[in-house]
Amino acid sequence: MMDFEGEIIKARADYRDALITEKQTYERIHTTTKTVLAEVGIETKNEAVIELLEATGLAAYDATVGRIYLLPELIDQSLDAAAKTFAGDEGPNTLGIGGIPPFLFREGDQYPMPATYDELEHLIEIVGENLDVVRFLSQPVKVHKGDPLKCNLIMDQLADCIKITCSAYMDGEEAVKWFAGRDDWHDSICGVKSPLSCMDNMMDALIQSARAGNNLRLTTMPLAGRTAPQTPEACIVITHAEVMFMLAVAQTVNPGMLCMFGGMPCTTRPDGDLDYSHDAMDLLNVAVARLNMWVTKLPTVQSGGSTGAKIPDDRALADGIRGRRILCDFGVHNARHCFGVLDNLNFFSEQAFLADCQAQREYLRNRSDDGDLTPLYLPTDDQAFEVIQRVASSDYHVDCHTTANLGAFDDWAKAVADKGLLPG
C-alpha cells in the first residue's frame, strides 16, 4: 500500500487541509462503526457464529433480541491479524469484472436468459484476449442451471489473472477446497444482508471457506436510503460494520488469512432502483476504498465504472468511461463491475465489454497523471450513529433521516463537480 500520510503532506497546498479533514472523517467512521457493532450489534441465529465469537471473550449474544454484540477490541484484534497484502496484488486502480449478472444481453431477445456453457466458454476466451486491462474476474454471467464448479473450471483456463468464485453456491466440502492454497483464486462471500442482518447459511459457508484456507473477499452491497442511511457517511458506516463483522468471524477461525474488504455501497433513485450511472456511486466507492487504504490498511475491492443503461449504446459506453475515470483519477485499489455490464448489473454484454476494454486502453494511453492526491470533499453527518441506532436492521426508507437527506448524493456530486474535479 502507498504511504498516504506522506501523500497528504505532499499534496497541493490548496488540497492539503481538505485531505486532512477527509482522513479524520474516515477515522471517525471507523470509530463509529465499532460503536455500532458494540451497541447496535448484528442480527443472527447462527449458533456456530455465536459460539465462535463468544469464545473470544469479546462478544456476547442477547437471545431476547437475537443480536450479537462485538467489543471494539475484537475488531482491533481482527484487523491486526488480517493480511494486508496478497499474491498477485497489482496495486492501485486494478480493474476487473464480477458480480455474476443474471442475464446475457442478446440483441432482439424477447425474454432475458442466462448464458449456456458454450456461451460462457466463448466469453472467457474474449476476456482472455483483454487481460491487459481486465486483471481479475468472477463469472461474467450466470449459466442457466449451471454447476458452479463446472463454471469455475471453465474460468480456470485463464492464467495471469485472479479468478473469483463463491463457495457458498458449491455442494460438498471438496468443492470448497479445490482452490485452497491457490493464489490465483479468491472466494467472494456475502455473509451479511443489509442492514446488519446475518445470512446464516452464508456465514456457514464463510466459516467453511476460512477453515479451508481460501482467500476471502468479504462483500456486502447496502443500498443508500433503503438498506442503509441516505447520507454518504452513514451509508459507509453500515457498509463498514457489516464487513468488520465478517472479518471478525474469519480472523477468529483462521488468524492472518486474507480478507479483502468488499463493501460496495450503492446509490439509489427515488423509486428505489439502483443508480450505477450516478457520479456519487463512484465517489462513494472511492471513499470506502480510502477508508481502508488510509485507516484499516485492508486490501479493498469496490464497485463502479458501470451504467444503468439497458442496451450497449453510446450512453452505456459514456457512463463506463466516466465512472472508470472517476475511480482511477481519485484512486481505488481494486474495482469490479467495470467492463461489459448493463442495466445496473442485470446484464452482461460482449459488445459493451469489448467497447469498455478499448475505452480503458485509450484512457490509460492518454492519461496525464500529475501524482497529486485529490480530496473527495466527503460530506459529514453528525447523526450517523443516531439513525443506525434507531433503525438498526429495519427499513431506512421510512425513517425521517432519509426524507431529510434525499438530495445528499446529488449535492455531493455537484459540489465535487463545481470544484472542477469531475470529468467535463
Predicted regions and their residues:
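Helix-rich catalytic cores of soluble enzyme domains
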Residues: 111-333
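Glycine-rich, N-terminal phosphate-binding loop and its surrounding beta-alpha-beta segment
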Residues: 48-111
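Short acidic (Asp/Glu) and glycine-rich catalytic loops that position anionic groups and cofactors
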Residues: 8-13, 54-61, 223, 265-269, ...
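Hydrophobic alpha-helical bundle architecture
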Residues: 285, 289-291, 295-394
